[in-house]
Structures are given as structure tokens and as C-alpha cells.
Amino acid sequence: MAEVKSDIEIARAAKKKQIQEIGQKIGIPTEHLLPYGHDKAKISAEFIKSVKGNKDGKLILVTAINPTPAGEGKTTTTVGLGDGLNRIGKKAIVCIREASLGPNFGVKGGAAGGGYAQVVPMEDMNLHFTGDFHAITTAHNLLSALIDNHIYWGNELGIDTRRVVWRRVMDMNDRALREMICSLGGVANGFPREGGFDITVASEVMAILCLSTDLKDLEKRLGDIIVAYRRDKSPVYARDLKADGAMAVLLKDAMQPNLVQTLENNPAFVHGGPFANIAHGCNSVVATTTALKLADYVVTEAGFGADLGAEKFFDIKCRKAGLKPAAAVIVATVRAMKMNGGVKKEDLGKENIEAVKKGCANLGRHIENIRQFGVPAVVAINHFYSDTDAEIQAMKDYVASMGEEAVLCKHWAKGSAGIEELANKVVALAESGASQFAPLYPDAMPLFEKINTIVQRIYRGSEAIADKSVRDQLHAWEQAGYGNLPVCMAKTQYSFSTDPNLRGAPTGHTVPVREVRLSAGAGFVVIICGEVMTMPGLPKAPSSEKIFLNEAGQIEGLF
């Protein structure tokens, strides 16, 4: 077997083109690219406005089975498929999310594809990139500062300090900041109250940026944020604090999508980064809709498995933005099938056909779930060197028994040459007109019924359970006019249940709803289930321990 290069070695050896050249490939004039160095740029708002009349290309969603520690390669497949479509003569753009610093220094490592299916410049994308996350964090925390400042200077709006619901954020995993008391230290520092931090990717400002259609829409949504309640339970909005204008100013440049390139010099839009387990998990609407005006095909991903990312992509992003996906790709691996079939991580390299067959139940559930949205799907088997022909065939046979097709993909090792078959299959599906996309539930359905619909139809649980205070809160929001909003489920990504260790395709479980949060600006209700946290912690040995600068000043250990 040939020597296997690391992702970073491959990325550093990339022959990148000037970003203006990449823009020209999809019709973006140089004057409408705002460069950040030679290999990344923002696309001007004027250009985005100018292409609104163009015909839309076809939208392809890449999703996956429930993630395992073995790794599925969803971003890698998204990037590979974009390259593959360009290889077979289609004009394609990849749309993915920006990486969060917290997980990069925690457990995940870099997020820009892998092998010969990567987006570059990888190091920049995994660190500060073009400053979007900084802008989002700053806008969010400006609002936090304005709340406490308003209370300090007399509290004219009558904010009940026990009912401030706007928490602070930072782009780092730090469990010590989850719950805290702020404004300690005497009269000069304000009125002490309970508060806390979430990670930036869970911020409502992040969700708003990713769902806004333009700057005007952005400012309106920012004004709609509910920051606190008065003693009579009436809401206090960000616009009551006159925060929306200044927040929009901080986010003006961050609203513009970022253009970068794949290893094969094809265009990629990287913009926004909400997590899919604690937020809606999709890149920005502006990036996706702009890409659709410039390409025949737009390949995008939604975070984690189809039970989380794809459900939110369909029920939140597509519903809000009027998008109609033409086809879906479900990424799965032999290794993950074995893990779902009960094999331990250290034994995944050994052939075990029975475990593959047993673990396929998880894949089957995701295939059924995508069908519920009326979108035709194909399974991409992301190839690992340890996979045997018999194991691959067992997966293909299972998918065929479900009435779908599985295609073996070797883009990690071969780039676009290893994914041509999938590219052709996706084109055939998209061009067939078979997609009859519809969200899972109507707008008018009561909020708790929406939760139960997802629990029963997607997770195959028996019901959602919630105490009276949660149900009363949902009812109060319905009475206040928020009943038409979609729900955004926050739960573990590792299982259809709320137990991360319950793999495979469980049925009949209950899903406990711990807390609900109204994101009035983003336009959804967050449903926090089980033990999921909106501020993650670092593991015992965080990946930051292995990250350093070598003697040449290059970054080591980030990927």
C-alpha cells in the first residue's frame, strides 16, 4: 500500500489558485471579491443582490448516519461530491459551515474535509478565518452588556433580573462558565444576578445570521430577540434596548459569504456555523441561495446524523428560505455499521460481516426518515482501507433490500476520480424530478405536537415527556403568537434516543424535554432534551495538548 499522507501534508502541498480566479469560474467579478489574503475572500452584498434574478441550480443535501467515534466523513463526502460533479462537467459549488474553535481544541480536530477531498486554506478555516465568529460573539455580548447597563442606570424597562434569559457566549469549550453570578463586587458593578455562558455556535445571533436573507432582515431579526421578561411576564426585546442597529453594524461584513477553494480548485462557500445538536446545524441561507444562482448544482451538508441535521435542514432552513432540495446523499461507513452492530472501536479493523448486517438497522432508519420528506436519496459508502469486499457487499445488499442504491466512494484517497459514480447517480436523481419535498409538520400544529411528531416519526420513540412548567411555557408562547414557529431539537447526536450509548435503531423510548428556549429572532423554539449542554466542556486530554508551532513556524497537531 502506498504511503498515506496526513490531511495537513496534503493541504500544504495543494496548488492553490488566486481567489480571484476561483471567483471568475462562477462569474464573480474581481471588484466584487473582498480578499482576505490571496486564498479567501468575501462576496460583496452588491453582487449577491445582482444575481437574485438568475435561475436556481439544484440543491443536494449530504447527511449521514448517527456519528460514531470511527468517523463518517460527511464534510469529506460533501467536498468530494462537489469536485466529482465538476469533474463530470457540471458547474458545482460546495456550501459548508465554518469551524468552531472550541471543538478544535477539544475533541474534534479540524473540520474542512479530509484526504484528497478538502477545502483550503485549512489552517485559516479552523482558526480565525475571516473573523465571522468574532463578530457574532461580539454582537451577542454587546447585547449582554447593554442589558446589565440598562439595569444599572435605573431599569426604565422594568426588567425582572430573575428573568434575564440572554446568556453570554464565547467560542471555546469551558464548563466552568455554564452557570455563574455576575455583577458581584458592590454597588459600582451593578445588581448581582444569575447568568452563564453558551458556546458561540449555540448563540441565537449565529442562527439569525445564518437564516437572514439580507442586512434589513438581519436587523429586524436582531430586534426581535427576547432578552428578558418583566414581573408581569411581558417580554423585553433587543430593540427596546436600541441594540439592534449597533449589532447589525458589527455583523455587516460577517453577513457576506466567504469564498475559498477545494484541493481541485473548485469553489466552496464557507459561511456560518451553528451546531446541529444544540442549534439548527446548517450553513447560511445567503451562501446557499447565492450559490444556487451561480451553479448547476450546490452540494451542502447538515451537521451530525439525518435525525438532527437533515431534519432541521428540511424543517427549519428549507421551510424558512423556500428551498427545495432535489436529492440527498446519506454517508455511511463499514466501520460505523460494525460499531452499531456492537463491535468495539479497537476491533473495527477485523472483518465482521454479521456485525455489519446488524448495524445496518441504523442506516435503514435514516433512509426511511429521508423518505418522509419526499426527497430521493442515495447511500455513499465512504471507503476505508480496512473495509473488505464482503463487508461492502453486505452493506450494498442491505441498501438494495430497502429499495435504494449504495455507491462505494474513494474520494478520500483519490479525490474526484474516486467519486464519479456517485456524482453521476446524484445527477440522475436530481434530474429525474422525483423530489416531492415537504416539511414533516405544518406551521399551524401546536408546539408540543411538533415535538411529539419528531420524536415518534424520526426518533421512533413512544412520546416526548415534559413537566407542567415546560408545557405551560410552550402554551404561553403559543398565546403570544409564536405557535407557528418550527421546533429545533437539542439532543445527543450519537443516538435516536437521548442516551448516547443506545446505538442501532431503538424504538419505544421516551424523550425527556428538560428545558425550552424561545429564539424569536431566529424564528424557532429550542427544545433541550436529555443531558445535552449548550456550553460543552473539554475532555481529560484535550486536543490542544498536541497543537504547537514547529521550527518553521507551521502549525502542527490541529488536524
Curated annotation (Swiss-Prot):
Q: Where does ATP bind?
A: 68-75
Range of residues in the leader sequence: none
Please give the Gene3D superfamilies that the UniProt record associates with this protein: Domain 2, N(10)-formyltetrahydrofolate synthetase, Formyltetrahydrofolate synthetase, domain 3, P-loop containing nucleotide triphosphate hydrolases
A GO biological-process term? tetrahydrofolate interconversion
Q: Which UniProt keywords apply?
A: ATP-binding, Ligase, Nucleotide-binding, One-carbon metabolism
Q: Where are the transmembrane segments?
A: none
Which catalytic reaction applies to this protein? (6S)-5,6,7,8-tetrahydrofolate + formate + ATP = (6R)-10-formyltetrahydrofolate + ADP + phosphate
The family database entries (InterPro entries) matched by this protein are listed as: Formate_THF_ligase (IPR000559), Formate_THF_ligase_CS (IPR020628), P-loop_NTPase (IPR027417)
Q: What class of enzyme is it?
A: ligase
Q: Pathway membership of this protein? A: One-carbon metabolism; tetrahydrofolate interconversion
State the superkingdom: Bacteria
Under PROSITE patterns, the record lists: FTHFS_1, FTHFS_2
**What's the EC number here?**
6.3.4.3
Could you tell me one molecular function GO term of this UniProt entry? ATP binding
Q: Which NCBIfam families match?
A: PRK13505.1 (NF010030)
Q: Which family does it belong to?
A: Belongs to the formate--tetrahydrofolate ligase family.
What is the protein name stated in its UniProt record? Formate--tetrahydrofolate ligase
Organism (species): Mesorhizobium japonicum (strain LMG 29417 / CECT 9101 / MAFF 303099) (Mesorhizobium loti (strain MAFF 303099))
Organism ancestry: Bacteria, Pseudomonadati, Pseudomonadota, Alphaproteobacteria, Hyphomicrobiales
Q: Quick one: which gene encodes this?
A: fhs
